[in-house]
């Protein structure tokens, strides 16, 4: 399968054309418009800081549907007796930044300055969200992602 080169125009090839690993395109930018088009088509950026932007669309994707989450009895019991608290959208900037920093202490991070700025823009437009885990007032964990429709 060919890998398509993106330019300044906001477009993507048909996701069915992704290679066997899911690589679909290279280039383009992380503008809000392009990211929205990407995510609505199951495409996402993932690349090393020294490389051009790579756009992926693997055949299988992990999605969370918040309306369908089932919290087990043991998890409810744990949550009732732990000093950890969970919040949503209380500190998006620190969640994405800390995800980046923790990776830098190991082998580097695919979350570049440009990526961090792009997802902060999405959050400011209510298109991304974060889940935070706190121990007292200390942020000890979290996740972030794009939320379009009922999927996250």
Name each region found by the language model.
Residues 1-152:
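N-acyltransferase acceptor-side catalytic subdomain
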């Amino acid at each position: 399968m060919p890998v398509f080169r993106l330019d300044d125009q906001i477009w993507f090839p048909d996701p069915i054309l992704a290679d066997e690993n899911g690589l679909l395109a290279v280039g383009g930018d992380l503008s809000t418009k392009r990211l929205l088009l990407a995510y609505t088509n199951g495409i996402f950026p993932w690349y090393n800081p020294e490389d051009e932007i790579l756009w992926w669309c693997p055949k299988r994707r992990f999605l969370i549907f918040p309306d369908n989450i089932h919290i087990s009895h043991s998890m409810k019991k744990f949550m009732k007796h732990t000093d950890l608290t969970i919040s949503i959208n209380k500190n998006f900037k620190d969640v994405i930044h800390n995800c980046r920093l923790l990776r830098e202490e190991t082998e580097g991070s695919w979350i570049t300055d440009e990526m961090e700025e792009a997802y902060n823009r999405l959050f400011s437009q209510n298109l991304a969200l974060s889940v935070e885990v706190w121990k007292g007032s200390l942020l000890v964990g979290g996740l972030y992602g794009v939320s379009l429709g009922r999927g996250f």
